[in-house]
Amino acid sequence: MSGLAKFAGLAVGVLSLALSLGCAPAAAQSRPWLDSTLLAAAKAEGSLVVYSSTNEQEGLPLFKLFTDVTGIKVDYVRASDAILMSRMSIEFRADQKSYDIAQTSTINKMPLQMLAAYEPPEASNISADARDSNKRWYGVYANYNAPAYNTEKVKAAELPRSYEDFAQHKEWAGKVAIDGTDNEWLKAILQHYGEQKGVELVRNIVAVLKPVVTDGHLAMARATGAGEYWISLNNYVNLSMNVRLAGNPIGVWALDPVTLFFGQVGVSAKAPHPNAARLAANFMLSQECQQFLAKFGRLPTRKDVQSTPPGIVDMLTQKTVITVLMSPDEERKWQRQFDQLFKGR
């Protein structure tokens, strides 16, 4: 079976958003991202294909907003970061023009030739560290990492003030979780503490708390909010906030270091609808888009968009923030070390 054929059985939902052809961009004056010349060229192309790892509960209504404003039909293909990375690589080698924009947290790991160099006008409004110097990707939301806790199981006064303090809580053994892919967090820990001290710190935490290694950050956040786990040793703050906004008893607190990477958008070098791709990339960096995503707990990369609830970014940035953007080789190295420390292999 060829590499391309293997994807025939993948459960990658291709979800076509409703087309609102009668929707005129009369509101362009209030939408700086909606360039009239680019819009006309994009509408002539007919549609937009999005590859995204964002869950459908957020992604579908977000791109329905794009469709309602522009009249451009969107095919939304949702899968995990790993599946999308593999799929895009195979399609690129096969010279397929299959998607227009990618929206995942791993675009910075893609070879430069797979992405078009493009600087959306709205990029000037996002933080400097969320802009790729090669103009291949831009941060749509900030993926801050911090521990989380079930507010009915653990009192705020009991929370550790440093990662060293975790080993003092033997009563939490077996009630602490961490996702099995948190290699970015591990790299930040060792960078902050130094390799020897950092490894000793993690080994102490594992020995005392015996963390449950989970599969899926959102599932872990939901399990923490439900009380299955009392503590998430680390998780994406936006997902913990998503569960909190749904009415569950979960909170976050910040420790040194706070790991940061980004949910990113990039334009395919082989986009079948290049003008629609550029318009959509600009939309993803707009105030309108980031305000929409903030309703789900996503943390904005724009200074003019407030987090939900307010003050989360300010709390996190009072600590030492370490931005982690790794190549595929670096990620494999840190994942091996993570597996050795947390899984004993």
Please annotate each region the language model reported.
Residues G9-G22:
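Bacterial N-terminal signal peptides
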Residues T308-R345:
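Extracellular/periplasmic bilobal clamshell ligand-binding domains
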Residues A128, N143, E171-T181, V202-V206, P211-T214, M284-S307, ...:
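Periplasmic-binding protein-like
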Residues A146-K153, L190-H192, F262-H273, F292-K295:
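A bilobed periplasmic-binding-protein/Venus flytrap-type ligand-binding module shared by bacterial periplasmic
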Residues T106-L112, W230-P249:
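A ligand-binding cleft/hinge motif common to bilobed small-molecule-binding domains
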Residues S30-D35, K43-P61, G263:
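Extracytoplasmic "Venus flytrap"
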Residues V49-K64, D75-E228:
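Extracytoplasmic ligand-binding site segments that recognize negatively charged/polar headgroups
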